[in-house]
Amino acid sequence: MLNSVLKDAIKKRDETLSILKGPKFEQIVKQAKSNWIYFSPTKQDVVVAGIDSSFNSTKFQGAELWAVTAVSVKSDGEILVDLHEHGLDSNPELASLASKMEIDACLESVDKAELVLMDGSLYSQFLTRQKSLANSLVNAITKKNNVVFVSKTSNTKKQFENLGAIAGDIFYYNHATISPGFSKIHEDPKFGNDMIISSVFARLAESLPLIKIELLGSGYDNDDFKLIFNKILKNIISGYPYALKLAHNNCKISNKDLSKLVSIHGLSNEIGSREVLE
């Protein structure tokens, strides 16, 4: 079956790719080029913190053994906040708990760093979280107005909808330029006037991967984003802030970690338990 699919894919490769690009690909890329603002950041020495969370679980006779962590880490490796919880119950809301812990870590970090970087998209926070969590997040962000959301990928299709874009915005910017800089600021009032998201796609040096930068609120100008790029440039690894890489590495709960948790509780010897999949 797989071989047949692969052979068919080879035959239809160009046809499939043409669907992704769509009939107005060149027109959209031209628009993306005109949206691009050339800017080469200058390193600025500031304290930057990165925040990320992780959760994992394994089922056990109708219940789940789970663990959730969230950390805030400075670019030099100093851990500012280390939050963690675990338990054994049924249907735990792990994503919501991880989000709450991220918000708590953010609230503790805004006074300890000049710039606080949150891993992921503000869109996903507002789309998938309870209203109470969204309100808590807004309060954390507006406490010092120094919180920035950074993501390596993006599925948003906002900037080229009127041109019949099929792929996400980031696809067209990737094809438009390899130069350092950023796209024109896009403001999205989808979640209401108190939750407007202002965003740009940015490349901090030539040929580096694009990242998406999101801020809460409206009225930002190009200089506001340039200042952010200057602040995060010093500790960039492959185009991505090192503080966020450290946060990810420090909070990640692997299946191996979960297996240790199972062993500590003696559940691996219980009837009906199953090995954590690697």
Please annotate each region the language model reported:
Residues 1-42, 46, 78, 94-278:
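Long, contiguous domain-sized segments
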Residues 48-51:
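Short hydrophobic beta-strand that contains or immediately precedes a catalytic carboxylate
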Residues 53-91:
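Acidic, metal-ligating active-site segments
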